[in-house]
Swiss-Prot record:
Pathway: Amino-acid biosynthesis; L-methionine biosynthesis via salvage pathway; L-methionine from S-methyl-5-thio-alpha-D-ribose 1-phosphate: step 2/6. It is an enzyme of class 4 (lyase). GO terms for biological process: L-methionine salvage from methylthioadenosine. Zn(2+) binds at residues 95, 97. It comes from Microcystis aeruginosa (strain NIES-843 / IAM M-2473). Binds 1 zinc ion per subunit. It catalyses: 5-(methylsulfanyl)-D-ribulose 1-phosphate = 5-methylsulfanyl-2,3-dioxopentyl phosphate + H2O. This is Methylthioribulose-1-phosphate dehydratase. One of its GO terms (cellular component) is cytoplasm. Its EC number is 4.2.1.109.
Length: 205
């Protein structure tokens, strides 16, 4: 597999400009092979990333390579590890902190968020009429490995309907079989979030 870092840099700049990765928030990763992945280093502005702002991590969590000696893995690295282990076909995993992702956390009921039956759900693989689809929602903890452990536990028993999950009042994570697919998934999910927020503001007829 070719080095994905330049593609991740371009995606990060785009998401930064959209307001999804401000203040160094969020992290993007892509597999290098079946055993490791590049992930954005902690504390780096996503609007100014270079190829040097990454850490190569094994699926076991061991750091294999530092693009720069001062780099350290993102705080959410454990979430990416779990996604790649649970879904071996995934080649990329994107985690962003948009305003809408935080606002829709208010609409969650228990451990899931009901999604509206929008046409855009087809882009997430939902091809049924009047679909009833739920996005898994997880509690937010300062101890990120605890979040990762809960994701692993739930998804091992109840696989998600769509390749996305929401961490309450934190952000959304998506994954896909290519970098392009993962970016498309993120755009679709954020579109749905914007719809939910707008619909909440519209008075019923």
């Amino acid at each position: 597999m070719s080095d994905p870092r330049l593609s991740l840099v371009a995606a990060a700049r785009k998401f930064y400009q959209l307001g999804w990765m401000l203040g160094t928030a969020g992290n993007l990763s892509a597999k290098v092979d079946d055993h490791s992945f590049w992930i954005t280093a902690s504390g780096k502005s996503k609007g100014k990333l270079t190829e040097q702002d990454f850490v190569r991590v094994e699926l076991t969590g061991k750091v294999r390579e530092l693009a720069h000696r001062d780099n350290r893995p993102s705080a959410e690295t454990s979430i990416h590890q779990v996604i790649y282990c649970l879904f071996p076909q995934a080649q990329a995993c994107y985690h962003v902190h948009s305003v809408e992702a935080n606002l829709v956390s208010r609409f969650a009921r228990g451990d899931k968020l009901s999604l509206p039956p929008l046409e855009m759900l087809k882009g997430l693989g939902i091809w049924v009429e009047n679909p009833q689809v739920f996005m898994p929602v997880f509690a937010n903890y300062l101890d990120v490995p605890k979040i990762a452990a809960e994701i692993e536990s739930r998804f091992s028993t109840f696989p998600p309907e769509i390749p996305a999950l929401l961490i309450s009042y934190h952000g959304v994570t998506v994954w896909g079989e290519s970098l392009e697919t993962t970016e498309n998934y993120l755009e679709i999910v954020e579109y749905i979030f914007r719809y939910l927020v707008a619909a909440y503001q519209v008075k019923p007829c």
